[in-house]
Structures are given as C-alpha cells and as structure tokens.
Design a protein with these regions (language model features):
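ALDH superfamily catalytic-core signature
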Residues: 43, 70, 78-236, 299
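Rossmann-like NAD(P) dinucleotide-binding subdomain of oxidoreductase/dehydrogenase enzymes
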Residues: 1-114, 166, 256, 380-383
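Conserved residues at the C-terminal ends of beta-strands
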Residues: 52-55, 74, 122, 279, ...
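Conserved C-terminal structural/oligomerization subdomain of aldehyde/semialdehyde dehydrogenase
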Residues: 105, 207-222, 226-397
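A generic structural signal for well-ordered alpha-helical segments
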Residues: 13, 87, 151, 188, ...
Length: 397
C-alpha cells in the first residue's frame, strides 16, 4: 500500500500533464526514494517530480502555502478533515482517501466456506492494515453457527511471523496502532462482547501483552507488533470496535435476523469505503448491494477491486472526497475548460444583441413556435415571424 497507492496517482498526474510534489508516510521513506528513481529512469524532466521529507504536522501547511493546484491525501479521517479545512481557507481542491469500517454481509444462502475464507483474507491480510478490509461481519441467523465454525477453523490455521513464504501475515506497523487495537478489544469485552478465537503467533523475540480468550492480559511469545488474529462476537454496534476504524486483525461478528437488519447495521456508520455481500442469489445480492452506502461493493469477494485500475476507488461519508483510478482519476487531475466558437463570425451582430425592440421579441418567440409549436399552423406562423426578424437583422461584412 505505501507504494501502490501513491504510485498510481503520481503516474496519472504526470501523464495528465501535471507536476507532482510527493510526501510519503514517515515510516515509509524508502518507498518515496523508489518512486523518485522510477520517475527519473522513465525519462521525465527532473522539474516535474519532487520528493520531500517532512513531518506530517508540517507537510499539509507547507504544501497548501506553496501554491499547489490540488492536494491528494491518503490517511486518517481526522487528518483529512484538518487538511480539508485548511485547503478550504485557500480555495484549493482536495481529494481524500480516508478510513473505513467496512462491513461484510453473509446472507443465509451464501457460499459459507468461501465466505469464511474470504473474511479472513479481507480482514487480516497485511495484519488487518487495509483501509478496504473487512472489520464488521453481519451474518443471517440460519447461516450463523456454520459460518462461525468455519471462520474459527480458518483463524486457527493462520500462520503469522516475520518475512517468509511459509507465513500468511506479518505484524502491525506501529506501537501506537497496537495500543489502539488493544484498547478497542478490551472496551468491547467490557461491554459484553466475547473473544471466541485467537490465532497462534509463533515468533522468536521479546514478549508482548494481548487479551486472551477470557479477556485477561496474557504474555504473547513474539515481537510486540505481531498481534494475533481475533474473532470478537458482538451483540450491538456500540463502542469503538464497531464505530471506529480498527486497522488491525480483528473480526467483529454479529448475528442478524434479516437482510433488512444487515443493511441497516452496515449503513449505521460514519464511514462508507467498501462493503461486500455474500449470496448465491443474484437478485438478493444485487438488492442488498444497491442499498449499501459504500463507494465499492463486491459480491462474494472483498478487498480486491483496488487492484482493478479501471474501477473508481473512493468512499461515501467520512471515508473520503473524490475518486481515484480509472477515468474519474483523470477528471480529478484536470481542469474543465469550455471553448465556444461562433459559427457565423462574418455576421455583423447577433439578432438578439442591442438594439432590442418588440420585433426581436416576437421573432425569437416565433423561433420557439417553429421548433415546439403544437400543430402545423402555429409552426408556420412562428416561421413567418422568425424570417421577418432575420430579414431585418442579419447583415454580413
């Protein structure tokens, strides 16, 4: 993500005729250097692309005060809101790709084995650090127990550890993120949620503290940022685990009594980036998808459309402003200009220019009658009035 998200916007901006100033996340400086090297080796003029190294708190103001024409930002909703306010003071347009609290709806006729595997793929890939990943799962009651059993099996099989082809996911990126996830889980457990599964973490470094299946703090044998995959069973959508972005390997699962309840609860969020519907009925899946308040909805899949460059990417509500990818990204990177040519430039003046009198009014009204009059007589009368006006007003050099 630190490479893929900026590089497609940078490439599109350059191909659209823009110059680019790029600042990457503080934790990802080598990625910026790689993009700069790619641009240089592609043969673009050096002045078209600049990489800057600034702290996040300084970068926004520096960019906005530096005379840019548009600001693109990917990050938290809180930071995006601040940048939009500051850009608004300067009337600088913005495109914001922000957070998500993405919902997965599993209907009673869903392919449950695929749904369980898909929930783990979309919920914990990159250790759950995907803005478009699954964070909330709503399952219709007839499918709930079977789905939950399959989901637990999938989580038990997750292999987590350092870089290797023999592991499925790695670690979190920052200690700050680990603390946030831990706080959300502990708050949910205090509100009555149940931790029903936690994946094994087999690494060889210093220990860390994470909640165990009883909600108590336990020592995790592994590097502190290797947070286990956890399934949390919840009954209500209160609390930060269900309302705020988690950005970690936590799957919050809840049973619903109907597709109507699933839609209502999925939409009961300040975010609206992505969502998914799982069902073997095209009619049901389409009906539910059409009512979800999300910029991207996938059917029987999740966390995959970002890799389709032709499809627009962006969210509803507090998940962002604008769209990236595809034709809409090009529109975000260009200004609309209208150029109108007069077809009769040798005419001395248009018939509706001054001086104006009643004959002009009647002649123009006759044009309307000629075009839209009801019946042949009103149209012929309109044509007569129009031709009288043209004969009097039209003069060429």
């Amino acid at each position: 993500y630190p490479f893929g998200i900026p590089v497609h916007e940078v490439a599109a901006a350059l191909l659209s005729g823009n110059g680019v100033i790029l600042k990457v996340a503080t934790q990802c400086q080598p990625v910026g250097d790689l993009i700069r090297r790619m641009i240089r080796e592609a043969g673009f003029p050096p002045a078209l692309f600049h990489l800057v190294h600034l702290g996040g708190s300084k970068a926004g103001t520096a960019f906005l005060d530096g005379g840019i024409d548009k600001l693109f930002f990917t990050g938290s909703t809180e930071t995006g809101r601040i940048l939009m306010q500051e850009a608004g003071k300067r009337l600088i347009p913005v495109s914001l790709e922000l957070g998500g609290k993405d919902a997965m709806i599993v209907l009673s006729d869903a392919p449950l084995e695929r749904a369980a595997a898909g929930a783990v793929w979309a919920g914990v890939s990159n250790c759950g650090q995907s803005c478009g990943g699954v964070e909330r799962i709503y399952v219709e009651r007839p499918a709930y127990e079977t789905f939950l059993s399959l989901l637990r099996q999938e989580v038990r099989q997750i292999r987590q550890g350092p870089d290797s082809f023999d592991v499925d996911i790695g670690s979190l990126t920052t200690e700050e993120q680990r603390k946030k996830i831990t706080q959300q889980v502990q708050e949910a457990l205090s509100l009555g949620a149940r931790l029903i599964e936690s994946s094994p973490v087999e690494t060889h470094a210093k220990p860390a503290q994470t909640p165990d299946l009883q909600g108590e703090s336990r020592v995790q044998e592994g590097y502190p940022l290797f947070y286990p995959v956890q399934i949390i069973e919840v009954d209500t959508d209160t609390g930060s685990l269900m309302q705020e972005e988690t950005f970690g390997p936590i799957l919050a699962v809840s049973v619903v009594e109907s597709e109507e309840e699933a839609i209502r609860r999925a939409n009961d969020s300040s975010y609206g980036l992505t969502a998914s519907v799982w069902s073997l009925s095209k009619d049901r899946a389409s009906r539910v998808a059409s009512r979800l308040q999300a910029g991207v909805v996938t059917i029987n899949d999740h966390l995959m459309s970002h890799g389709m460059p032709e499809t627009p990417w962006g969210g509803f509500k507090q998940s962002g402003i604008g769209r990236t990818h595809g034709d809409l990204l090009i529109e975000e990177l260009t200004q609309v200009k209208v150029v109108v040519w007069e077809r009769l430039p040798r005419m001395k003046r248009n018939i509706f220019w001054q001086p104006i009198d009643s004959a002009v009014y009647e002649g123009l009204k006759g044009a309307l009658s000629l075009i839209a009059g009801k019946g042949i007589v009103p149209r012929l009368q309109g044509a007569r009035r129009l031709f009288r006006l043209l004969a009097r007003k039209v003069r060429f050099f």
